[in-house]
Amino acid sequence: MASMASLIHRNLQRKQKPFFLFLFQTRLFTDSATPSQSIEKILVANRGEIACRIMRTAKRLGIQTVAVYSDADRDALHVKSADEAILIGPPPARLSYLKASSIVEAAIRTGAQAIHPGYGFLSESADFAQICEDKGLKFIGPPASAIRDMGDKSASKRIMGAAGVPLVPGYHGSEQDIDLMKSEADKIGYPILIKPTHGGGGKGMRIVHSPNEFVESFLGAQREAAASFGINTILLEKYITQPRHIEVQIFGDKQGNVLHLYERDCSVQRRHQKIIEEAPAPNVSSDFRSHLGQAAVSAAKAVGYHSAGTVEFIVDTISGQFYFMEMNTRLQVEHPVTEMIVGQDLVEWQIRVANGEPLPISQSQVPLSGHAFEARIYAENVSKGFLPATGVLHHYRPVSLSSTVRVETGVEQGDTVSMHYDPMIAKLVVWGENRVAALVKLKDCLSKFQVAGLPTNINFLQKLANHWAFENGNVETHFIEHFKDDLFVAPSNQLSSNDAARLSATVVAACVISREHSLLKENPPGNSSLSIWYSSPPFRVHHCAKRTMELEWENEYDSSASNLLTLSITHKPEGTCLIETGQEIFPAVEVKATHLGNNDFRVEADGVSMDVSLAIYVKDQTKHIHIWHGSHNHQFRQKIGHELSDDDEAQHKPSFDTASHPRGTVVAPMAGLVVKVLVKDGSKVEEGQPILVLEAMKMEHVVKAPCAGGVHGLLVTAGQQVSDGSVLFSVKDVTSTVNSMLENLRLLMFSDENHGLMPYVAVNVKQPYLRIK
């Protein structure tokens, strides 16, 4: 076995080619498991992409799988992917995916010998791992004792401190009295980081810059931690202002062997959640990598660890010192980038280690080949502070898979991204022979990844991948904040951006017309003898057929401005369309579009040929058209008319639009649950004062007063569901209230009993006696 691993290692160093597919088909483990220990059926206690990913490996190993699902996930992809599926409760996670008794009961009912927890939910619950063991079920993960020691971030820091691993200054005690915590925060010194002692994913984390913010931040972190992990204990740490987030993948077996599989850089984050990860970490020396790996292995051995785990470190970019942050006692979301560079299936390792088999290779035999990136594709409103989004995936076409491109997903076209769970749509994972090659592939795949129906972060990921600092590997956890002017502000060449949108609009028009003609040829209306009028180009006597099409460009940089494009289209005899925008600075373009089927087209414009894809659907009584061509993608809206004909969306979803509401009106920025109302209707508030707290996808969002004044129409209560765009309350300032009263008085003075205006007599209506500005 060792010779086989060495041979693979030598070949990798020589050829530098992706090899994980070969290794996934090669048995490297020994047959130490007895027949009574063998796992033949696994219940996956999770949902979404990780459940699908676990099932894929299990099926390759010939192991049957059982899915669990809530009412909201009845038709989910992970349910369809399993051999069996069991309903475990209503949509809220605390009543389904976090309900250990229901999951264990489902495993016993279906005859599963083991439970794989995935990540999140119960994956880091020592109690759940212990229940599995007590019921005779294999928990595919570390022992309950290790989860308890390392899953509790306070306890893990005490263990690491005793082992001599550097720690960030902070408070890791069990006493949670708010006055004590506030005192400890003062001792540490601001800014401080508040975070839950259990769980991960950035949930419950708060950066606090001053004592005035502490109480509300602390209570909010407790609520979010309780909702996400069922435990609300908190720890405090000094906030390092320029850190890198580097983590080490470790793996242990039940024979006491532990090794590391190198590090991942996860520094690029928003809302304390990673969005682009890579392995190995850029700009890291071999000595630093070795010291980091050794520290991670020592941490795992200190608690008798086996299975997959991740030791996370904060690296101070100023001093170069690394500090232990926490240990995640589970498989990480970003584990695929490690699999890509070491050529191992970590889920297979988990299953075999749970079966009692030793690790297949030693530390010296762990290969390191090439570079890998993972980009997390989320349903979220980037321009609204990355707030999670909900809606229907009207169009979903990931990139093509290959030996160097993976897509981990738990959704398919037509699915709904709900408010109950994490808004991740997919993980795009790419491999290259080096970082430059891998980054080129990442950019290309992002430009071809098609999602329509709800807002996503794909364009933002493209900006990140193309940023000069990211290209150079100069990353740290404040990357997005530091380069916000580059990432969020419109391109300096606004004219070029408008030109690209107009080109896309002309291509859309040509493709829509080509699609119409294809449909009319297949199903001519009325008497077939009239089909000449529906030919391509349409037949006309003594002139060319013309039409007008209006498209409204959805500009991600300026959603408030009107970007209405009026296109004049002339059908030419040779089958092309002459498309004019009505502006002299944009000349007419002659375009020919050939419908290839579905929503794919081949377009020729000004001597240039391009492949084009469209997505067309109806939402909010408006046609939405998305176009992808080359590295460009744009979105347009169109009033419903005869030009297009698609089925309407099944459910109406209010848009986030406050333009039609009076000044001071506050609408829900996302669909969610009201978890706390902080003031009463009629209360006087200051600008920026928190009014209520919304929770969606296990993340809290504080809704604040837009101005000083009185709160009116605050009718929502804690526990109430609200839809995206629904009115929550309004704040009326004194000025607007007085002006409104004067206006009403003026109308009353000049109206008769029949509410008709009386003749203008003594008072100048246009000049009231008093007007407060």
Please state what every model-predicted region is.
Residues 69, 240, 328-331, 381, ...:
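A generic structural motif
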Residues 2-311, 315-335:
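N-terminal beta-alpha lobe that positions the nucleotide/phosphoryl donor
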Residues 296, 336-587, 690, 720-773:
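Catalytic cores of soluble metabolic enzymes centered on carboxylation/carboxyl-transfer
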Residues 186-188, 199-201, 227-231, 242-244, ...:
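Short flexible coil/turn linkers enriched for glycine and charged/polar residues
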Residues 657-758, 763:
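Structured functional modules or segments
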Residues 312, 564-569, 573, 593-598, ...:
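N-terminal non-catalytic structural scaffold regions of very large proteins
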Residues 43-44, 87, 116, 193, ...:
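Structured core elements
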Residues 602, 606-611, 617-698, 702-705:
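Glycine-rich adenosyl-nucleotide cofactor-binding module
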